[in-house]
Each structure stands twice: as structure tokens, then as C-alpha cells.
Curated annotation (Swiss-Prot):
It comes from Methylorubrum extorquens (strain ATCC 14718 / DSM 1338 / JCM 2805 / NCIMB 9133 / AM1). It comes from the Bacteria. Catalyzes the conversion of 7,8-dihydroneopterin to 6-hydroxymethyl-7,8-dihydropterin. This is Dihydroneopterin aldolase. Its EC number is 4.1.2.25. Pathway: Cofactor biosynthesis; tetrahydrofolate biosynthesis; 2-amino-4-hydroxy-6-hydroxymethyl-7,8-dihydropteridine diphosphate from 7,8-dihydroneopterin triphosphate: step 3/4. GO terms for cellular component: cytoplasm. InterPro entries: Dihydroneopterin_aldolase (IPR006156), FolB_dom (IPR006157), GTP-CH-I_C/QueF (IPR043133). The gene is folB. The keyword Signal does not apply. The keyword Ribosomal protein does not apply. It catalyses: 7,8-dihydroneopterin = 6-hydroxymethyl-7,8-dihydropterin + glycolaldehyde. The active site is at K100 (proton donor/acceptor).
Length: 130
């Protein structure tokens, strides 16, 4: 599927990280989502009910990132991907990228980041029903 809905660099302040200082002080993270799904029905109908709202995607990412705490940004990304796949059946695959510009690394860098790609066959809900 070539069609995509993108949410790029949603800024959140949160307390994720392995170190106690990361939990205590918190830091900024940037979350990007790329959802692959068929956008033709929405394009033809001009009806938001025929697509996935990028506002809803951003709200899910923001809610999970600010109301839950994870030691690893990999776990944060998994939680976002699982929730989006469970909530929106139209999404075929989702890529979640977490940028951590203030990662506690003794080097000069723009950011550390992870990116995961998950699809329906990877989701926990699908696995449990097999």
C-alpha cells in the first residue's frame, strides 16, 4: 500500500528513560507516525469517516507518552503501535519513530532515535486470537 497518513515530530515532554534522573527531570521527545492504509475511499467520498484522523493518531501518541512511563523508548513505540492498530482497523501497517534529543550519551549528537514497523500480523490482538 502506497497511501500514508503522517504525523511528523509531535513534541512531548515526558519522563521516559533508564536513569533515575530521566524520570525525575523529564525531557522532550519527538514522536513520528507513518500509517499505511487505503486512502482512496476518503479521497473519493470526502468523508472523514472513511479514513483515520491524524488528530486521533496524535492524541493517542500524546496520551500514551505523557500518562505512562517507560524505561525504554522501544516500549513506548510498541504501546503506541499496538493501540493504533487495535483502535483503527483501516491501518495496515504503522511505523513509529521516537527521537530523544537529550539522550544521556557522552557525545555531541542531534538525537538518538528508534523506529519500529508493525502490521496486523504483529499485533498482540491478532496473535492472541490464533
Amino acid at each position: 500500500m502506497a497511501d500514508r497518513i503522517l504525523v511528523h515530530r509531535l513534541a512531548v515532554f515526558a519522563r521516559h528513560g533508564v536513569l533515575p534522573e530521566e524520570e525525575r527531570l523529564g525531557q522532550r521527545f519527538y514522536i513520528s507516525l507513518e500509517c499505511r492504509l487505503d486512502l482512496a475511499p476518503a479521497g473519493r467520498s470526502d468523508d472523514v469517516a472513511a479514513t483515520v484522523s491524524y488528530a486521533d493518531l496524535a492524541e493517542i501518541a500524546l496520551d500514551i507518552a505523557t500518562n505512562r512511563r517507560f524505561a525504554l523508548i522501544e516500549a513506548l513505540a510498541e504501546a503506541i503501535a499496538e493501540t493504533c492498530l487495535a483502535r483503527f482497523p483501516r491501518i495496515e501497517t504503522i511505523a513509529v519513530r521516537i527521537d530523544k534529543p537529550s539522550a544521556p550519551i557522552p557525545a555531541v549528537l542531534d538525537y538518538a532515535a528508534i523506529e519500529i514497523v508493525r502490521g496486523r500480523s504483529d499485533s498482540v490482538a491478532t496473535t492472541e486470537t490464533r
